[in-house]
Amino acid sequence: MGRLQDRVAVVTGAGEGIGAAIARRFSVEGARVVIAEIDETLGRATAETLAAESGNETRFVPTDVGRKADNEAMIAAAVEAWGRLDVLVNNAWGGGKISRAELKTDALIDDGLAVGFRGPLWAMQAAFPIMKEQGYGRVVNICSLNGVNAHMGTLEYNSAKEALRAATRTAAREWAATGIVCNVICPAAKSAAFHRVMAEHPELIAAADAANPTGRIGDPYDDISPVALFLASDDCRYVTGNTLFVDGGSHINGSAWAPDLPDEP
């Protein structure tokens, strides 16, 4: 029997990268998983692959986490399909652009906050009454070293993820007596977003590996998803409001991330 046997989980941004790795881990550990993903091709493919691999049910729900209605719909889809919701993983991110802080546009900042902060908060608010009624819930928010280490060029991303860390701690405190625990993972992994950024800055790939105390950036499935599994499991019942740095020690002395930033927004 898997560690999440018969549990129901929603994972956002689960079509690729860290989200797909976490969804896969949950599925092989017995969970029924909603793949909440904006890209229909990726989302459907992941749902089908996981169901075939694990034999457990999955459901793809097209989701733009920057829209409140979509966050509510993905939660409702899990309850409609399986009658409960045990685990919520807020992982999705919509992109952003590397540029100087003084050149960030209102639109770029608004988009970053909508996807990186408001979306996860809307999902948590939609999940809360269901988890409270059950007396059981696990919220895992995927944040980032970018905000912790003040990575250059990604102000809207850094700000959204640090706001989400604060919201996670607040929810953990307010919801502690209900059986809901809320925690954060700050990963260092070669995610889909990592590969997209590095495609624009290939010179930083070797530097990113070298800057990590272990000499490498982590793997989403082998390094990140086992920690998400712990935070989603019964074993996490007395752990709440924490940030787990699953990063090979990258947070210890900051980061060498220092790209040459463009002079236009």
Q: Which stretches of residues belong to each language-model region?
A:
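Conserved glycine-rich cofactor-binding loop
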Residues: V8, G15-E16
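Conserved mid-core segment of classical short-chain dehydrogenase/reductases
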Residues: E72, G95-D110, E133, G153-E156, ...
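Short C-terminal tail/terminal secondary-structure segment
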Residues: I98, T240-P265
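Catalytic Tyr-X3-Lys loop
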Residues: E102-L121, Y136, V140, Y157, ...
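C-terminal substrate-recognition "lid" of short-chain dehydrogenase/reductases
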Residues: L121-M124, Y136, I217-V246, H251-I252
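Active-site helix of classical SDR
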Residues: M124, A160, T168
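Alpha-helical segment proximal to the catalytic Tyr-Lys
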Residues: P129, R173-A177, R237
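Residue(s) in the substrate-gating loop at a strand-loop-helix junction
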Residues: S144
